[in-house]
């Protein structure tokens, strides 16, 4: 089957449909008469996507995203795909890549935030009253450039969802599709009666790593020949693969919404008490109590629960959302913190002077008036862990790039895309909100998925006030808090102790039956 035929099978008139979806959502956010910076970015992306012939590949993800959001959960797209404004408007990314700005949901008044600090994001700024209607304007925008990060032909998407079955059902219903179960993959055949309806058990669904929209012509029979090499399918013109992972965070946040009645869309990005949790755990307690740990309050907070993240967080002391994004990147990259950024911070460099994201490398050079093409090539060289060339070093010296920054570039092995860090920082923020404001619901929901081991039951039965010494004896906590001998078991024991010290009833089994 020719790609254009397959594109029509997935979505007829995909260019037109994707454009309508994006323009409608942009109009809802920014008014029908789009501000110039919004219109310019959207048009540039849509033209690029249409020219690449991949508009139809956005539609299945849009279908999945709508279904996931209808359940009260969210979808997270991995990698640089999340940087596209089109992805944001389709709902398959929660990251608005535009420059920092305010927009009013009531009258659609929009203001660009005048900042020359390329690392700042909209969430760093306080709420502002709309000069037109007097309503509250919301800050937004993560300042992610477009062209280097949007790839033309994408045979595969990687997403995190609360449940793989939701993805399968959404596509099955929309396309009136049959399904064939393969080895860790479900093949969905649009408009086909050649296969039975999907009825695999939950264990099979959890083990999935791919869902494939496949042309019935490709199959050509009532049962799929699994001898097809994965690479052959991926390079085919008539297959779309969706790599899926069942995300524990999405499941946990869905559970917390059910328990508290507060959804993630109701959580403010301007809560100073939440940012304080990433500096100290004192705010978790109602009295003047000084906690046992002397550490930050991020036990149980994804991406910030382990000692390496603590070490970075304590070194940089985050006080705004962009700081959290950088911490995630420093923790996730290779060769960006130890023997690199950590040393520079100790020497007095600012968090946002050091390398954390690949986009920041390019934006830093652009701020130094380096040509766009040169800035892009240097960024590509650094992010792939390659040392800068002599020509690049001469160019950087000529542009006034300090030697310490050039040396830092050459120490990098792998640096993260900003979209990944933003997505993780947002999840951490949401979880921190629930932990601070709904402690019982947070600890209950968290441990609901962790309490299978008998040690938790033993902890609950034998807990008594001020048992921190017992914990140290159990898992050598003194060494653990020196960042040695740390694992998830130790973390969960500390979390249980924290819950008890905050007055939370540890009898989780009576809270959740079945």
Task: Place the predicted regions along the sequence by residue.
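Noncatalytic, beta-rich nucleic-acid-contacting surfaces in large DNA/RNA-processing enzymes
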Residues: 1-514
């Amino acid at each position: 089957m020719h790609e254009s035929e397959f594109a029509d099978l997935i979505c007829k008139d995909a260019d037109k449909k994707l454009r309508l979806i994006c323009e409608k959502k942009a109009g809802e956010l920014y008014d029908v008469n789009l501000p110039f910076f919004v219109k310019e970015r959207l048009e540039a992306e849509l033209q690029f996507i249409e020219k690449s012939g991949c508009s139809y590949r956005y539609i299945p993800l849009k279908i999945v995203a709508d279904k996931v959001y209808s359940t009260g959960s969210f979808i997270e797209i991995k990698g640089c795909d999340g940087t596209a404004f089109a992805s944001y408007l389709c709902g398959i990314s929660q990251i608005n890549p535009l420059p920092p700005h305010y927009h009013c949901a009531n009258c659609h008044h929009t203001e660009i935030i005048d900042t020359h600090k390329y690392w700042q994001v909209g969430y760093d700024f306080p709420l502002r009253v709309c000069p037109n209607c007097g309503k509250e304007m919301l800050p937004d925008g993560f300042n992610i450039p477009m062209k280097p990060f949007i790839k033309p032909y994408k045979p595969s998407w990687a997403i995190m969802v609360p449940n793989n079955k939701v993805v399968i059902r959404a596509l099955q219903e929309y396309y009136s599709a049959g399904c064939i179960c393969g080895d860790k993959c479900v093949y969905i055949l649009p408009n086909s009666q050649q296969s039975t309806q999907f009825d695999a058990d939950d264990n099979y669904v959890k083990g999935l790593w791919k869902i494939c929209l496949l042309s019935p012509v490709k199959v050509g029979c009532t049962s799929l020949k699994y001898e097809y090499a994965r690479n052959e399918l991926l390079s085919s013109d008539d297959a779309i693969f969706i790599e899926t992972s069942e995300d524990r965070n999405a499941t946990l946040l869905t559970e917390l919404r059910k328990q508290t009645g507060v959804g993630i869309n109701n959580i403010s990005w301007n809560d100073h008490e939440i940012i304080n949790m990433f500096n100290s755990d004192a705010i978790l307690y109602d009295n003047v109590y000084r906690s046992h740990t002397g550490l930050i309050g991020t036990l149980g907070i994804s991406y910030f629960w382990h000692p390496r993240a603590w070490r970075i967080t304590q070194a940089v002391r985050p006080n705004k959302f962009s700081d959290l994004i950088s911490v995630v990147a420093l923790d996730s990259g290779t060769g960006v913190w130890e023997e690199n950024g950590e040393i520079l911070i100790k020497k007095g460099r600012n968090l946002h002077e050091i390398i954390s994201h690949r986009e920041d490398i390019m934006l830093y050079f652009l701020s130094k008036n380096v040509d766009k093409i040169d800035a892009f090539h240097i960024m590509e060289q650094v992010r792939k862990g390659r040392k800068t060339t002599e020509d690049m070093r001469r160019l950087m010296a000529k542009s006034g790039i300090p030697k310490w920054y050039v040396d830092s570039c050459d120490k990098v092995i792998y640096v993260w895309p900003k979209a990944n860090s933003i997505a993780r920082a947002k999840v951490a923020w949401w979880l921190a909100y629930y932990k601070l404001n709904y402690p019982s619901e947070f600890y209950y929901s968290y441990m609901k998925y962790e309490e299978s081991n008998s040690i938790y039951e033993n902890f609950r039965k034998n807990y008594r006030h001020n048992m921190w010494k017992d914990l140290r004896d159990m898992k050598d906590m003194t060494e653990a808090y020196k960042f040695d001998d740390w694992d998830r078991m130790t973390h969960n024991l500390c979390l249980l102790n924290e819950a008890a010290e905050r007055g939370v009833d540890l009898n989780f089994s009576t809270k959740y039956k079945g």
